[in-house]
Structure formats: structure tokens, C-alpha cells
Amino acid sequence: MRSVPGPSPPCTRSLAHSCRAAARGPCGSARPRARSVSARAHSSEASDMARVQQNFNSAGVGLFFSLFGGNQSLALPHLAAPDIRHVDWRALKAAGFKGLVFDKDNTLSLPFALEVEPRLQPALAGCLEAFGGRAVLYSNSAGLQQYDPEGKEAAALEAALGIPVLRHADKKPGGGCAELEAHFGCPAPQLIMVGDRYLTDIAFGNRHGMLTVHVQPLTTSGEPFGVVMARRIEEFWVARWTSFGVHPPAHSLAPHDTLAAYVKDQPIA
């Protein structure tokens, strides 16, 4: 792991502002599919297994404490946006990136829901079109060997969202990137990691040299208590480290002075 200073802070309208605002609140083919499901269906299709396992992440806890000894840059995203509608995916593809790695809950869908959040569906469709469908879901429940050994959760997500779910052995931020590189057929630094959690999604992507994109959670309603508390702690420390001048790791395909161009104040789609 490394801490690489950069000439400018991570791109966002202001990462520190984004974090503080949040704290104030409580290579496969894919096409997105819109599903008409009610809140009742959302509740009935929620995974009890996922609810239990999200309360504790030993790899995330271990990384959090290690950051106090250095390498705080691992928790800082290259791009920070309200949601995926504010990111210029076509420009990122033109910069040389070859694939997208998405977290699911609170990034593309409400927690445990089996549908893409309706307001994000056009943006996701455009995003997948820009990358030729080269996207995958990387979940800390579905597809994870420990909790989904037979791939039933993964298969349900694939059928519902129309995006491949990566089968893998370790929870983010732990584990390697061999499965991702095998899936996409390219090295990890040519991939983009997108998620709403600093110490899981962003730290995992940065550990393996990906470009990292942090989005604000779609909601905190329905999240396990442990996740809510962990999120508040993450937001506090990321805002603090950013205010101290810590930057995300440098990336050869997206130098620090180019990052601002990839995030827009108004939704692109």
C-alpha cells in the first residue's frame, strides 16, 4: 500500500464538503433492466443473509486502524459525486479505462433491493453503453464464497439487474484482484471502482490501483445499525484527512489535474 501526494485534492465540487454534508445526514456484457417492484416486493426479496453479514467486516476494521499509521490516501476517492448521473463515463472511457466495478447497495439500488433505483436507470444504461457493457457487480454478500457458496444470491441479482455478479473469495477491502482481472482481461489499474463506502469500496479499489468513484448513499433507511455507525465514522475521518491535505493515490490514466473534468454539478443523464 502506498500514500502518493498529488498536486490537487480529489475531484468533487468539494470532497470535504460532500463528506460533511453526508455526515450531517443521519470484461462481461451487461444491460440494465428496469423492474416494476413495489416497496412490499423490495422488503420481501431482501436477503436476511446480507443483512446479518453487513454488520461486521473484519478486513474493513483492520484497514481502518492501519490507516492511522499512514496510507490514509487509500480511503480517499479520486472522484466524488452525488450519484452516477454526475460522472462523465464517456470521458473516462476515452481516457483509457476498460471496465466498471460496481458496488450494489446504496450505489445502484436501495439496500437489499433487486432493482436499479429508477432515477439512476437512464444513467446506468448510458454508462454501460459507453463501456460496451463491460461492467460487473462486486458485492460483499452475493457471489462471496463465504456467504453465497452456491451462487444463488448472485444468480438472483444477475437475473434482476442484468449485470454479471463476480464470484470471489474475500470481502472488500480484503482480497486480491485476480478474479476481476480474469473477468475483464485487463490489469486492475484500467478498471473503475464505484461505491458508497470509503473503507470497503474505495479502499479496495485504491489498494489495487483502480480509479475510485465515491457516490453518496441513496438512503440510510433500512441499513443495519453497524453499517450506519461505520459510515458516520468513515465520513468523519475522510473529511478530516482531506482537510489535512491528504490526496488519493496518483493514477496514470487520470492525473490529479484532470479529475475535475469528470464530475459535473448537474446530472449528465
Curated annotation (Swiss-Prot):
The keyword Transit peptide applies. Changing residue 103 to N: Disturbed phosphatidylglycerophosphate phosphatase activity. Impaired phosphatidylglycerophosphate phosphatase activity. A motif (Phosphoryl acceptor) lies at residues 103-107. Residues 29-46 have a biased composition (Low complexity). Residues 25-46 are annotated as: Disordered. It is found in: Plastid, Chloroplast. GO terms for biological process: chloroplast organization; glycerolipid metabolic process; phosphatidylglycerol biosynthetic process; phospholipid dephosphorylation; photosynthesis; thylakoid membrane organization. The record marks 103 as: Required for phosphatidylglycerophosphate phosphatase activity. One of its GO terms (molecular function) is phosphatase activity. Residues 1-33 form a transit peptide. Its main location: plastid. Its EC number is 3.1.3.27. It is an enzyme of class 3 (hydrolase). One of its GO terms (cellular component) is chloroplast. Pfam families: PGP_phosphatase. InterPro entries: HAD-like_sf (IPR036412), HAD_sf (IPR023214), PGP_Pase (IPR027706), PGPP1/Gep4 (IPR010021). The keyword Disulfide bond does not apply. It catalyses: a 1,2-diacyl-sn-glycero-3-phospho-(1'-sn-glycero-3'-phosphate) + H2O = a 1,2-diacyl-sn-glycero-3-phospho-(1'-sn-glycerol) + phosphate. Keywords: Chloroplast, Hydrolase, Lipid biosynthesis, Lipid metabolism, Phospholipid biosynthesis, Phospholipid metabolism, Plastid, Transit peptide. Pathway: Phospholipid metabolism; phosphatidylglycerol biosynthesis; phosphatidylglycerol from CDP-diacylglycerol: step 2/2. Phosphatidylglycerophosphate phosphatase involved in the biosynthesis of phosphatidylglycerol (PG), a phosphoglycerolipid predominantly present in chloroplastic thylakoid membranes and which has important photosynthetic function. Required for thylakoid membranes development and chloroplast function. Belongs to the HAD-like hydrolase superfamily. This is Phosphatidylglycerophosphate phosphatase 1, chloroplastic. It comes from Chlamydomonas reinhardtii (Chlamydomonas smithii). The gene is PGPP1.
